[in-house]
Each structure stands twice: as structure tokens, then as C-alpha cells.
């Protein structure tokens, strides 16, 4: 099993040459998104048509209570590289992490983005502090609760990026002094129902695939937790390459063991794959690797209640289910 991730030399050479996406690279990206959406590679032309005909969708990317890990995951996308993604696939009109503006200039950039006549997709990364009126989380003197409700109310669609935004995540872990909660719960009084792209961090393909689905088919079908079924419709366990060892009752006794390196099941080392819905085994990260293949048990990071409900990690705290 591979424990390393290497960026293909040809990909680096192409990026160093001029940073532009060729037609072939663009269609490859569309194919990756189409497969992740469950449509198959044959849907790639439709994805390409949507992105080209409708123009690059404007994205207003807000940051709440978070570690910026979801943005970091997106920034480390290599197929395509993030600059190609921002300049040729979406129009990232506001994002505090990567924008040059700061202070009042950043505030003006946000207000300009909100006046876009073509509309915009609002993405919120991070939980929203609500205790004492939300004073524990502010941007430019305005509480995140107030600002995000205002930005989200005018959006064509709202996407909660990551588990903190989806369900509160580690920001809502006990004792949760700021009263942090997920976007859906925080903005429900304003009639806002976001699409939850859960994960810590989520796969960038799931985010881009959701944007493409909004362009091509409108609102995707969501599960009971507000996640797109096309990405979160199957458990990690049912897609895992180690599943055959689970069926054979072959469980790795330790992380350093020969059995773990040979691909035996990590369930007794705390793997939450049987209880976690995500497409990590098929989408992988940068189409190269994912935690369980690399030897780390799934910790259920895309599930409601993560962090508290699934701790302690790396311990077999549940019995093997007959349904697993």
C-alpha cells in the first residue's frame, strides 16, 4: 500500500509553463467532477457546457469560527491547481484568506460582490458563535451571525463548507464557550437552508461538484443531514478497499503491524467507516490517496456530532454490526 503522495512531474511542468488550462485538462477536470457526482465520465461534456455557457459562477466565501483547514484543502487542489480553479472555473469574488484587500478595502470588495447583478453563491466555512448575541465572532465590528445572515439571504444558493459549518464540528465541542453551532441551525430563523459539504476537511471535488450541479440541474437531492446524496449517499465502509478483510474477520492488531500494512481492516483500531457517509474511497484527495488507504482509521469527520459523539478516536467503541 502507498503511504506517499507525489504530484506528477508533467502536471508541475505544465503549471510552471504558463498556468493555463488546456482544453484536454479542462475536460479531464469536468470528467472528474462528473464521476464524483455519480453521473459517469460521459456527463463531462454537459459539465463543460454548463461552466462555459453560464459563465463562471460568482462565489462569496465567508469565514466563521474555523481553522481554515477547508480552505487549505481547496488551495492544495492539484488537478486542477487552485489558480486555474479560481480564474477559469469559478469567480472567487470574496475570500479573506486569499484576497489582497484588508480592512475597509475588503469590506468594500464584499459589498461590491453582493451587488453582482448575476447573483452569487454564498459559501460559509466555519461554525457561527451565537452566545451573547454572537459577540464571540465578529468581522469588521459586525457579528458573524448578523453578517452571514445578510450575505446568505441574498444568495442564489448557500453552501456550508466543512463539518464546522455543517454541524458545528470541533468549534461546538464541549464546553463550547462561544455557543458555536452549524450554519443550518444558526440561520434557520432567517429561512436559510444551506447545502452541507461535510468533512474535516471536505474533498474539494464535492464542493465544485455541488456548484456544477447548481448550474446544470439546480438544487441537488439532500440526505437528512443536508448533505448531497450524490457524495454522501454511501458509507465509507461499503466503498473501502479493506472491506474484504472485514468480511473475513481479518483485523489489524496495531498501526505498526504487518497486517495493517497489508491492508487488513482497521475497525478494531477505531475506524468509523461503517457509520460514516462520504465518498473518500472513490474521490480520494487529489485522486491520489485517502486516510484509510494510507493506514489511518476513518474518524467519522463528516458526521453530525463530530467531534464529541465519535470520540475517543482510535478505539473500538462499538460492536461490529450485523448490518455493516
Swiss-Prot record:
Taxonomic superkingdom: Bacteria
UniProt: [4Fe-4S] cluster 1 binding residues: 67, 70, 164, 200
Cofactor details (free text): Binds 1 [3Fe-4S] cluster.
Matches recorded under Pfam families: NiFe_hyd_SSU_C, Oxidored_q6
Gene Ontology BP annotations: anaerobic respiration
GO molecular function: 3 iron, 4 sulfur cluster binding; 4 iron, 4 sulfur cluster binding; cytochrome-c3 hydrogenase activity; electron transfer activity; ferredoxin hydrogenase activity; metal ion binding
An example Gene Ontology CC term for this record: ferredoxin hydrogenase complex
Localization, UniProt: Periplasm
NCBIfam families assigned: hydA, TAT_signal_seq
Identification of the protein by name: Periplasmic [NiFe] hydrogenase small subunit 2
The organism's taxonomic lineage, starting at the top: Bacteria, Pseudomonadati, Thermodesulfobacteriota, Desulfovibrionia, Desulfovibrionales
Name of encoding gene: hynB2
Amino acid at each position: 500500500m502507498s503511504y506517499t503522495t507525489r504530484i506528477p512531474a508533467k502536471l508541475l511542468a505544465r503549471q510552471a509553463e504558463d498556468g493555463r488550462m488546456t482544453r484536454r485538462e479542462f475536460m479531464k477536470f469536468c470528467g472528474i467532477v462528473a464521476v464524483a457526482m455519480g453521473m459517469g465520465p460521459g456527463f463531462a461534456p454537459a459539465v463543460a457546457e454548463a461552466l462555459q455557457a453560464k459563465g463562471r459562477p460568482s462565489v462569496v466565501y465567508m469565514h466563521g469560527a474555523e481553522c481554515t483547514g477547508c480552505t487549505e484543502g481547496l488551495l492544495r487542489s492539484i488537478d486542477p491547481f487552485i489558480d486555474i480553479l479560481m480564474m477559469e472555473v469559478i469567480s472567487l469574488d470574496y475570500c479573506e484568506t486569499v484576497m489582497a484587500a484588508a480592512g475597509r478595502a475588503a469590506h468594500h470588495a464584499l459589498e461590491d460582490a453582493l451587488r453582482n447583478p448575476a447573483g452569487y453563491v454564498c459559501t460559509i466555512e466555519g461554525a457561527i458563535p451565537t452566545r451573547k448575541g454572537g459577540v464571540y465572532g465578529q468581522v469588521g465590528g459586525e457579528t458573524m451571525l448578523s453578517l452571514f445572515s445578510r450575505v446568505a439571504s441574498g444568495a442564489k444558493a448557500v453552501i456550508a463548507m466543512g463539518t464546522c459549518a455543517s454541524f458545528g464540528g470541533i468549534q461546538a465541542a464541549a464546553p463550547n464557550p462561544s455557543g458555536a453551532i452549524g450554519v443550518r441551525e444558526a440561520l434557520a430563523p432567517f429561512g436559510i437552508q444551506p447545502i452541507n459539504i461535510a468533512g474535516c476537511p471536505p474533498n474539494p471535488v464535492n464542493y465544485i461538484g455541488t456548484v456544477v450541479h447548481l448550474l446544470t440541474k439546480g438544487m441537488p437531492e439532500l440526505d437528512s443531514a443536508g448533505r448531497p446524496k450524490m457524495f454522501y449517499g454511501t458509507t465509507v465502509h461499503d466503498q473501502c478497499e479493506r472491506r474484504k478483510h472485514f468480511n473475513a474477520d481479518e483485523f489489524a492488531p496495531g498501526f505498526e503491524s504487518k497486517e495493517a500494512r497489508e491492508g487488513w481492516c482497521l475497525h478494531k483500531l477505531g475506524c468509523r467507516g461503517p457509520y460514516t457517509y462520504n465518498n473518500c474511497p472513490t474521490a480520494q484527495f487529489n485522486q491520489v490517496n485517502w486516510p484509510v488507504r494510507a493506514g489511518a482509521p476513518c474518524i467519522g469527520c463528516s458526521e453530525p456530532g463530530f467531534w464529541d459523539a465519535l470520540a475517543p478516536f482510535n478505539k473500538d467503541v462499538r460492536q461490529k454490526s450485523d448490518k455493516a
